[in-house]
Amino acid sequence: MSVVAAGMALGCARLGSALTPLDHTQSIALLQRAYALGVRHFDTASIYGQGDSERLLGEALAPYRDRICLASKAGQLLTPRQALLAPLKPLVRWVAARRQHVHQRVAQARAQGVPRCFEPGYIARSLHASLKRLRTDRLDLFYLHSPAPEVLEDAPLFARLAQLQRQGLFGVLGVSCDDLVLAQRAAAHPQVQVVQFAFDGGALSRAVAATLERSGKTAVLRGLAQWRDAAAPGDGDAAMVQGLRQMLDLPACAGVLVGTTDAGHLQHNLGAFQRALAQQEAA
């Protein structure tokens, strides 16, 4: 499926993680519910849930593979401690749900960040591993996951990525960015066709979107939560719809990324998305 027509994207960073409130069965049900509600763009990464996010997506969405946009990322690694504790994740999840201090320690450890590797061989191996976990032979969208700016100048890496793309292992190359400076550099890279970044409505985020538009490239946007959190009591989802309108009005916008593990929250976001689309069409 074309990423350009994907609409709202479900971010799956929390699926399979030690702190997710969902077990395996509930995670599968959430993904299938998302598909039933009309979500066709699913965003994950090799590191999410120590690979379990991809495994869950592969299991839940295999029957619909040709009808969805499947995106994943490579470049971040588990720490040695995370790798050691991965088999104990069900126990950690059970304890963290019942002991607040354990939950806090796990959350603090996650917030410290992870190692990164963008060596060509590692990225190729990571892509192949993701395909296996996702039960597919190709990705629609393959991101470099929060690289340092100098990674965008790594000619051997981009030569290897071009080779993998020619082999049909992924359709479109993107960069998922942690900041707008990196997003602007990624938008100008000749091989990068999609940039994922947090849109805040400010001048720099609009400049990134404008660069993408001029180059015929697209953006997948994060950041919707800032409008939701800024809403005044009694405003309902008006602020969220306003934020969505700002995103959807950008010609480069190919999708808005929303992460949730709650089916009700997902349905609410989709309702706001549809209202924003209706307002845009009526304008």
Language model feature labels by segment:
Residues A5-G7, C69-K73, V95-H103, L141, ...:
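Non-cysteine beta-strand/loop elements that form the S-adenosyl-L-methionine
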Residues Q26, L31-Q32, Q50, H128, ...:
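Beta/alpha (TIM)-barrel catalytic core signal, keyed to glycine-rich beta->alpha loops juxtaposed to Asp/Glu
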Residues Q112-C117, L144-E150:
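Surface-exposed cleft-lining segments at the edges of enzyme active sites
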